[in-house]
Swiss-Prot record:
One Pfam short name: TrkH
Keywords of this entry: Cell membrane, Ion transport, Membrane, Transmembrane, Transmembrane helix, Transport
One MF annotation (Gene Ontology) recorded for this entry: potassium ion transmembrane transporter activity
Name of the protein: Uncharacterized cation transporter MJ1485
Transmembrane segments: 17-39, 44-61, 81-103, 144-166, 186-208, 239-256, 268-286, 319-341, 385-407, 444-466
Topology in membrane: Multi-pass membrane protein
GO CC annotation terms, alphabetical: plasma membrane
Amino acid sequence: MGICRLTKKDIEGILHILGGIIQIIGIFTLVPCIVSVYYNENTFLNFLIPGLFFSIFGFVLKRATKPKNLKLHHTMVASALAWLIASFIGAIPLYLSIDYFSYVDAVYESMSAWTTTGMTLIPNVEVLPKSILFWRSFQQWIGGVGILVLSALVLARSGTVAYLLYTSEARQERIMPSAIGTIKTIIWIYILYTILGVLLLYLSGLSFWDALNLTMTGISTGGMSISNYSFPYNDFAKIVMIGIMMVGGVMSFSIHHKLLTGKYFNDIQTKYALIVTAFISIIISIKDKVPIIDSLFTVVSAMTSTGFTTINVGNLSSLSLFLIIFLMLIGGGAGTTTGGVKIIRFLVILKALLYEIKEIIYPKSAVIHEHLDDMDLNYRIIREAFVVFFLYCLSSFLTALIFIALGYNPYDSIFDAVSFTSNIGISLGVVTLKTPVIGKIAGIIAMWIGRLEIIPVLVLFATLYFKTLRLLKK
């Protein structure tokens, strides 16, 4: 049986997964109803009707199907479809509540939130209903921990299924011996940090509303603000608190688990992040004569894919913008809420290049052995790192070409294309409400494939392609 072949049982298994995901997203859609009622807004039905419909529809679909012999490529197909479905459902309340939004605009906004990219088409968010602002923040918060991670707790009747759902969303590491244990630990860490973030920001002088939304967008490294300014607070304490949240986002959940359990850790990704952050922050501060705290905040925001800024990025020099593009492309650590290629893959590529150089200059009799921390660098690991890096660069390049074809400045197009693909959210203003539909769709696709690290989307396309070929031959 070919990897791209889908039998009726395979399709039923995928539909079972999607049914559970649709049910969960439907339930999530009901949550903003509480905010709508509390603030006496007229958006209540805009959340209630789609929320109830998809909760029931997903429940029925899940009950009508059963998971049978699911493989990793099946859950990858389900994962790729899940993020699309989440955005299509999440867009409905936005479309119904924002008068000037087309449905494509709403899908763009929802995809940006779910994937924690943080791009927005809304020119004045401060006039939006509170329930809509909460929905944008809530989608980012859920998207940060992962739709499939949450769904695995509901859907998984076995550790195997849970692990397949977990890995299909571009995750590999285990914190606990079992997949279910790992997922539960991740969720509890995420909730704990969210509560701490809200509490600390509230004690710093923010209202509970601002503290809640800022924490949800900060801890998820989403960065979609409830203010017209990316980060409207000049207070040093608040900048530091959000900065700590963003730094937390660049560290993997396994590192957080070791921190919380008092175990020693010496993670190479964390070392890299701290060194590169300090180095590039100093360069930008000196080159563009901006305060070091603002430079540091912007660099951390770019690396963690949060997207908050305290300065106008468009005013930075070409060197600084290039360094930010580099940070956005590489992203944070594996097993984090951040986007990008991931630090560990970049380090693997550097080690592989070092190996090639050593092989040339060392004597033929020399035995060369490369490793990264406790990980031996074999062919499979190196190949995967190069493939993902190439696909990210290719996706960013193709997205930039579309923007350039629409008449946008090449430098701005490349910057925003990398920001889309790496789910960053820092923008030079390429995609706005006035952008042609094709430009918005390009942004949607770039955010989608970037969140899944591209491979599951390619598996989906390959599956659909070969399925279509077989149907045409009949």
